């Protein structure tokens, strides 16, 4: 009963702030918490938790808990911003991989 999403265009530290709050919670409690949470990644994590729930076949709401939520660093995309006198400053676009396991 797991679900993964890869190459999310948000930094892993911002994702971990949200996912650390739902580790160990029951499925229903985590869904309620994520619905009312601020941050643009909360909606994506809610979809991921619902996907992991739909992947489980024989479980009910009462049984399931969020066992682990792994947030791993994805590839970093390098961009450049033009500056004065022909210079350029690097801009790093971070990505994340998220894995949710229910048990």
UniProtKB/Swiss-Prot annotation:
Subcellular location, record wording: Plastid, Chloroplast
Record PROSITE patterns: RIBOSOMAL_L22
Keyword list, A-Z: Chloroplast, Plastid, Ribonucleoprotein, Ribosomal protein, RNA-binding, rRNA-binding
Gene: rpl22
First-listed, main subcellular location of the protein, grouped into a coarse class: plastid
Protein role: This protein binds specifically to 23S rRNA.
GO cellular component, one term: chloroplast
GO biological process entries: translation
GO MF annotation terms: rRNA binding; structural constituent of ribosome
Subunit structure: Part of the 50S ribosomal subunit.
NCBIfam families xref list: rplV_bact
The organism of origin for this protein: Cyanidium caldarium
HAMAP family, alphabetized: Ribosomal_uL22_B
Name listed for the protein in its UniProt record: Large ribosomal subunit protein uL22c
Pfam families the UniProt entry points to: Ribosomal_L22
Protein family membership: Belongs to the universal ribosomal protein uL22 family.
């Amino acid at each position: 009963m797991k679900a993964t999403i890869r190459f999310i265009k948000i930094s892993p530290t911002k994702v971990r702030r949200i996912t650390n709050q739902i580790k160990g919670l029951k499925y229903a409690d985590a869904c309620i918490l994520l619905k009312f949470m601020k941050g643009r990644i909360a909606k994506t994590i809610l979809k991921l938790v619902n996907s992991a729930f739909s992947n489980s076949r024989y479980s009910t709401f009462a049984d399931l808990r969020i066992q682990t939520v792994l947030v791993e660093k994805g590839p970093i995309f390098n961009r450049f911003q033009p500056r004065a006198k022909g210079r350029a400053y690097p801009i790093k676009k971070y990505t994340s991989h998220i894995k949710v396991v229910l048990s």
